[in-house]
Regions:
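Membrane-proximal extracellular/periplasmic loop immediately following the first transmembrane helix
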Residues: 1-38
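Active-site acidic/histidine clusters and adjacent loop/turn architecture
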Residues: 195-262
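N-terminal low-complexity, Pro/Thr-rich disordered segments
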Residues: 167-192, 357-397
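Active-site-adjacent loop/helix surface patches within enzyme catalytic domains
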Residues: 247-289
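Short amphipathic alpha-helices in soluble, non-transmembrane regions
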Residues: 10-17, 157-165, 308-318
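Second-shell loop/turn segments in exported
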Residues: 2-3, 78-79, 146, 225-237, ...
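Catalytic cores and adjacent binding grooves of peptidoglycan-active enzymes
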Residues: 279-374, 394-397
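Basic-flanked hydrophobic alpha-helices used for secretion and membrane insertion
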Residues: 9, 32-178
Length: 397
């Protein structure tokens, strides 16, 4: 299932942003397969037999990049060039001037040059950025977001969207760079790879993917038995200690009846080699493919339904370093995703199971002429740039 913006809806969003005096940009987030990495004509990585490394790719117009990164960054992302995030570059030892071979929608080879290595924010905490113009050779891709820059009035954008039938909060969401930290926010792909390891994969029919056997042998603990609450699942070794800590605390607090062990052991668990159910033509591996997420109580908490997970259980998992899917768009109440940092001490107006700590006051920034507002799922505040994102309901399972 792919939830993206139709061309018609994206056009209405752009019209609203323009009417509000700002500049709209269509943004795409395909996951593109990398099959080779070269330096001075020598292969550093070369994959065959349809194996590929998933590269989380941000695609946006050059004028968007100019608004948030300046002229020098646009020059580095010229035709046939990509910007690579610093974490992704670290993972593969990439340098400026290296060549990477990406595969288009028909799995044909397309070669790009690394024009610059940039802070992760400029690749949306993924792997690479390329301009819309450069990405045309990859083939058609779904519209993920409409981003606004050069904003003078946030409220005016909301008003103009509403007048065109774009209601924020039901089918669509708005994200801004001044948003408070979300306790259920997930890791960017490059951070996920650094924590859990990067793998190669190839399609295995339908939503299934085959993942590199060496990566699985190194990282997945097969049929691991947890104590206190007797789950037995295939999970990533990095997440196992935190899962055990959460389960032990749930048991110690007398909440074990809220974990359906039989259901979790048969229908839930961590590792599944598959695409994200929300992936499009350029499919992204699920967080479960990394063994980084745990599903429990699946019958009562199926995707899109109002979550029925016990809130004390939710907060315990947050304490042990998990984001909860009950506040994803759409809700995925069975899903706990390891992020590696405590999340129960973050005040945020969560729709379901908010933490029991004060919610900080959010101050709307002052918009000067030329300020930038973009819409993104994971955005960070900057002293020079203000950003906001309009996007359809999506998930990162």
């Amino acid at each position: 299932m792919n939830k993206s913006l139709t061309t018609s809806v994206a056009r209405r969003m752009a019209s609203a942003i323009t009417a509000a005096g700002a500049t709209p940009h269509r943004v795409h987030f395909p996951t593109v397969g990398l099959t080779a990495h070269l330096r001075n004509g020598e292969y550093l990585t070369r994959l065959g037999n349809r194996w590929r490394i998933p590269m989380a790719t941000m695609v946006a117009p050059a004028e968007y990049l100019r608004a948030v990164g300046g002229d020098a960054m646009v020059a580095a992302a010229g035709p046939g060039y990509v910007l690579m995030g610093e974490t992704s570059a670290e993972l593969r030892g990439a340098q400026v001037g290296d060549s990477i071979v990406l595969r288009d929608i028909r799995f044909r080879m397309r070669t790009f040059t690394v024009g610059a290595i940039v802070p992760n924010a400029f690749v949306d905490w993924g792997d690479i950025f390329m301009t819309t113009e450069s990405a045309q050779v990859l083939g058609p891709m779904s519209i993920s977001r409409v981003v606004a820059t050069n904003i003078t009035s946030y409220s005016r954008i909301i008003s103009k969207l509403k007048s065109r039938g774009i209601i924020i909060g039901s089918t669509y969401r708005m994200r801004t760079s001044w948003d408070s930290e979300n306790p259920d926010g997930t890791l960017g792909i490059s951070t996920l790879k650094k924590k859990f390891g990067e793998f190669a994969f190839r399609p295995a029919g339908g939503s299934a993917i085959q993942i590199d056997a060496k990566w699985k042998l190194t990282n997945i603990l097969w049929r691991h038995s947890f104590a206190d609450i007797r789950l037995r699942n295939n999970c990533h070794k990095v997440a196992v200690k935190a899962i055990q800590g959460a389960l032990s605390e749930i048991k110690a607090r007398g909440l074990q009846r809220h974990v359906d062990v039989a259901n979790a052991n048969r229908y839930g668990g961590c590792y599944v080699g598959r695409y994200n159910r929300m992936a499009g033509s350029f499919g992204a591996p699920s967080r479960h493919a990394y063994g980084a997420a745990l599903d429990i109580n699946t019958t009562q908490n199926y995707q899109w339904s109002v979550p029925k997970m016990n809130c004390d259980v939710v907060r315990i998992f947050r304490k042990w370093g998990f984001a909860w899917g009950g506040n994803f768009w759409p809700a995925d109440g069975m899903h706990f995703e390891y992020v590696g940092e405590r999340r129960d001490n973050i005040g945020y107006p969560s729709k379901y199971c908010p933490n029991k700590v004060p919610v900080p006051t959010t101050t709307l920034p002052t918009f000067a002429p030329g300020a930038t507002l973009t819409t993104t799922t994971t955005s960070s505040s900057s002293s020079t740039t203000t950003t906001t994102t309009v996007a359809p309901i999506t998930s990162t399972m």
